[in-house]
Curated annotation (Swiss-Prot):
A zinc finger (C4-type) spans 25-48. GO terms for molecular function: GTPase activator activity; zinc ion binding. It comes from the Eukaryota. This is ADP-ribosylation factor GTPase-activating protein 3. The modification Phosphoserine is found at residues 231, 241, 270, 274, 331, 377, 435, 458, 460, 462, 464-465. PROSITE patterns: ARFGAP (PS50115). InterPro entries: ARFGAP/RecO, ArfGAP_dom, ArfGAP_dom_sf. It comes from Mus musculus.
Length: 523
């Protein structure tokens, strides 16, 4: 037995997927499944096929219905005898309604269904061999191809048939041209007897008058491609009395006029009532004016000041433009502006520096007193020494805050500019070019220390500003000592000297004490 061809495989799966239950996934219900489980004969989506593949081929053998072309006849028979509906009913009959894939296909019901599908597929393969369809899955009847219809020909035929039907229909209410009724001929008499003329004097039956001009026909169902049944849209006119229509129109106009009059009456009544109220208010206000005996300017002022006792409805209110008076201020006093800077900037600078120096001197005086009080218990001489230092004039502290702290080379030398221009002309009259140092005499006042430093650094290949101005470079944190941290002020120098003297005296005192102890207890 050979393998089925690709056309046979496509034909079989096309037939199987046409079943409504096979158009969705057996496990999750996704549409258009393209994979199949041969072991159960069900259709699956690509996600559920991965879950079945993880179970193993001994539980579920997966193939693609579109990509795989090496199907065998036994595998195709498994799909034909199976199906999503058969598998679903079998699992429900055996009480397997779980959604878990592992639990579902490892259950007893799944094992029984696998054996059933295998048995039915083997029997179908032996019975039908290589036949494309089984008895239970017969080939679908081939329907003839739809015949192409000519749109214009069908439309024309429908119109012609409709016109013929309209002409064949008898008129419902027909009458003679003159409204006479004709009676059938009576053949009971002889052949010479003519038609009866008894109905000539009888008036014809008048047709019932219809209020509408055009008679509407009931809607009829349309057939074909929009063709209308009956005539080509023509509508029949009936006998209508135009005088009756005119009477109805006049009646409608009269009704509208009456409605307009009825609407206008309440408006007029409201206007009249409002006028009555206005006249009543005017009468009340007039009586109050007579009682208060107000007239002329007094009445206007009373109403403006709110003394109308609730009757101020004449439109008079407080006005900004009326009775406005301009009040002028007599002998205005101007505020004297405060001077932001009372003194010259240089004076303020020196005054601020003097204040700071006073505060700093006060700060430096306090530690001295504290130190003197602490050391007074050790030596009376030290106490007198600190008292002597604390009573000194705080001028050194004031001088320390000035410009004397800066190096002498960086300070601007104090010089006196040349008094008159005649001296400068006499001094520099024959010189082609001069500098500011020459003009102000700065070069002549160069300090001796600066010259000495320049001579000392003349042999150096490179110098720095710290070397030129004899400034100490910044030391590392490990090289700092108490002398570098404490400010270099005269008071601090005296403080250091006092500490050294006290320390020396303390050491002498300690040596004396130790010597006396050794002499007393050592021997």
């Amino acid at each position: 037995m050979g393998d089925p061809s690709k056309q046979d495989i496509l034909a079989i799966f096309k037939r199987l997927r046409s079943v409504p239950t096979n158009k969705v996934c057996f496990d999750c219900g996704a549409k258009n499944p393209s994979w199949a489980s041969i072991s159960y004969g069900v259709f699956l989506c690509i996600d559920c096929s991965g879950s079945h593949r993880s179970l193993g081929v001994h539980l579920s053998f997966i193939r693609s219905t579109e990509l795989d072309s090496n199907w065998s006849w036994f595998q195709l028979r498994c799909m034909q005898v199976g199906g999503n509906s058969n598998a679903s009913s079998f699992f429900h009959q055996h009480g397997c309604a779980t959604k878990d894939t592992n639990a579902k296909y490892n259950s007893r019901a799944a094992q029984l269904y696998r054996e059933k599908i295998k048995t039915l597929a083997t029997q179908a393969t032996r019975r039908h061999g290589t036949d494309l369809w089984l008895d239970s899955c017969a080939a679908p009847p081939v329907s003839p191809p739809p015949k192409e219809e000519d749109f214009f020909a069908s439309h024309a035929s429908l119109e012609v048939s409709g016109a013929m039907q309209a002409s064949a229909q008898p008129e419902s209410a027909s009458s003679t041209p003159w409204g006479l009724e004709t009676t059938p001929e009576k053949h009971e008499g002889g052949p010479g007897q003519g038609p009866s003329v008894e109905g000539l004097n009888t008036p014809g039956k008048a047709a019932p008058e219809v209020s509408s001009i055009i008679k509407k026909k009931p809607n009829q169902a349309k057939k074909g491609l929009g063709a209308k049944k009956g005539s080509l849209g023509a509508q029949k006119l009936t006998n209508t009395s135009f005088t009756e229509i005119e009477k109805q129109a006049q009646a409608v106009d009269k009704r509208k006029e009456q409605e307009d009059l009825a609407r206008g009456a309440p408006k007029e009544e409201s206007i009249v009532s409002s006028l009555r109220l206005a006249y009543k208010d005017l009468e009340i206000s007039r009586k109050k004016d007579e009682r208060l005996n107000l007239s002329g300017q007094k009445k206007v002022e009373a109403e403006r000041l709110g003394m109308g006792f609730g009757s101020c409805r004449s439109g008079i209110s407080h006005s900004v433009t009326s009775d406005m008076q301009t009040i002028e201020q007599e002998s205005p006093t101007l505020a004297k502006p405060r001077r932001k800077y009372q003194e010259d900037p240089e004076d303020s600078y020196f005054s601020s520096s003097s204040k700071w120096s006073e505060q700093s001197s006060r700060y430096f005086d306090d530690p001295m007193e504290l130190r003197s009080s602490s050391f007074s218990s050790w030596d009376d001489g030290a106490d007198s020494y600190w008292k002597k230092d604390s009573s000194r004039d705080p001028e050194p502290a004031m001088r320390s805050t000035g410009s004397s702290d800066r190096p002498s080379a960086r300070r601007k030398p104090e010089y006196e500019p040349i008094g008159s221009t005649d001296e400068a002309q006499k001094k520099f009259g024959n010189v082609k070019a001069i500098s500011s140092d020459m003009y102000f005499g700065i070069q002549a006042q160069t300090d001796f220390e600066t010259r000495a430093r320049l001579e000392r650094l003349s042999t150096s290949s490179s110098i720095s500003s710290a070397d030129l101005f004899d400034e100490q470079r910044k030391q590392t944190a490990g090289n700092y000592n108490l002398s570098n941290v404490l400010p270099n002020a005269p008071d601090m120098a005296q403080f250091k000297q006092g500490v050294r003297s006290v320390a020396g005296k303390l050491s002498v005192f300690a040596n004396g004490v130790m010597t006396s102890i050794q002499d007393r207890y050592g021997s």
